[in-house]
Amino acid sequence: KQGRRPMLVACDIYRPAAIDQLQVVGKQAGAPVFTLPGAKPPEIARKALAHAKDYGNDIVILDTAGRLQIDEVLMQELVDIKEAVPVDETLLVVDAMAGQDAVNVAKTFNETVGVDGIILTKTDGDTRGGAALSVLAVTGKPIKFQGVGEKLDDLEVFHPSRMASRILGMGDVLSLIERAQDAADEKAAEETAKRMLENKFDMNDM
């Protein structure tokens, strides 16, 4: 959408099918995926950066191994990656359904590696916003994006005011309106929004 040329880099060498899954995402997004079988993540990152410069990719996204519990080896691996290549931004992806484990990982991740922002996934679940508040409290870093589903289009810019509404049990009507606008013309979206606010939204509107 912004005319950039991103490249994804497969630095998760541990989880089975991680590279295959990243390649599927890359294909859907129209972005190349850099892989280097047999290499360690810091070396993969270095080679990927050189490759990106040669092929004109102006954004390089390093996909590293996920961690649901605190793992010193994997944490050190992230430190090694940041020492191997210049990193402009470090984003921690947090599962909103993971509870206290997510909070513990976020705290250790920020203390060990340093976090610039958070991506909160599975915010379409029933947890409302407890994870958002907890992660924000322990890291002091902003939540930049939220995942509301499994598709690429389900990654949205995070709006604190809308999460506050969810926590208070008011729902997130504005996000529903935005998604309706993407799928329909403006007049139809306005009518749909009006029906939502009047509690007249039915299966025909859906």
Model-derived segments and their meaning:
Residues 21-24:
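Structural and coupling elements of P-loop NTPases
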Residues 1, 19, 101-105:
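Short, composition-biased local secondary-structure segments
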Residues 1-7, 140:
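Post-Walker A helix-loop "phosphate-sensing" segment adjacent to the P-loop in P-loop NTPases
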Residues 46-48, 57, 69, 75-83, ...:
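Conserved phosphate-handling catalytic cores of large alpha/beta enzymes
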Residues 6-18, 28-85:
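Switch II (G3) loop of P-loop NTPases
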